[in-house]
């Protein structure tokens, strides 16, 4: 029972999603090779990053305890129900953070550790706080969400270059329509706790246009690894096809469907698209 609640506090769904994008960066650096040579490093960076993301989610839960208690989809979180106390959660998050730093420092490399720490600081220290204050919090949160593929890449090459920037941009531009789709789907919850989400402050119609704008930027960014010469033809074709398909389905839904169906369409295909891109990167 307690193990399940502690696992829930770490938000395993978010961890899993970020590890998929990390895999994309790792595969780009190794040209889709995870054989005996790279397997130990792949396992180490996956563990280290998973621990850091888990720590970030725990501290996010602590800070958001008050608003989580008022939203339907978060009312059963462990801190809200009292299954785990704030002190216990703080200790838990700190242990996860320390373990992550040790794994990444000793088993991966210092650059990757610093990159992941930056992601942690942006997520916990900037995004978590700013989402109560500004409509731009989602964009700020996109910075931390774009870190894992960069970490997967630097775990192998131990440098920051244009390929790392390309990975960052792909994930950053992907996250905005993905996140705004979630905001549209749970707009009533966000209204309850008075969070200044873009659909609430600027309206649904404006938000949908912004989503399509960032989706277009995402499509363009998907060509960058191939343009830079780091991704092969197969990867380029897959990336462009799925990105364009997402764009097509979103525009089609924008023209014909209700706001809620549009949000569901964007969200559903965002998961399929980023998974396909990351697992064929290289």
Curated annotation (Swiss-Prot):
Entry keyword annotation includes Transferase: yes
Official protein name in the record: Protoheme IX farnesyltransferase
Other comment: Carbon 2 of the heme B porphyrin ring is defined according to the Fischer nomenclature.
PROSITE patterns xrefs: UBIA
Subcellular location: Cell inner membrane
CDD domains: PT_UbiA_Cox10
Gene from which this protein is expressed: cyoE
BP terms from Gene Ontology: heme O biosynthetic process
One function term, GO molecular function aspect: protoheme IX farnesyltransferase activity
EC number: 2.5.1.141
Presence of keyword Hydrolase: no
Entry membrane topology: Multi-pass membrane protein
Primary location recorded for the protein, binned into one broad class: membrane
InterPro entries: Protohaem_IX_farnesylTrfase, UbiA_prenyltransferase, UbiA_prenylTrfase_CS, UbiA_sf
Organism placement in taxonomy: Bacteria, Pseudomonadati, Pseudomonadota, Gammaproteobacteria, Thiotrichales
Species for this entry: Francisella tularensis subsp. novicida (strain U112)
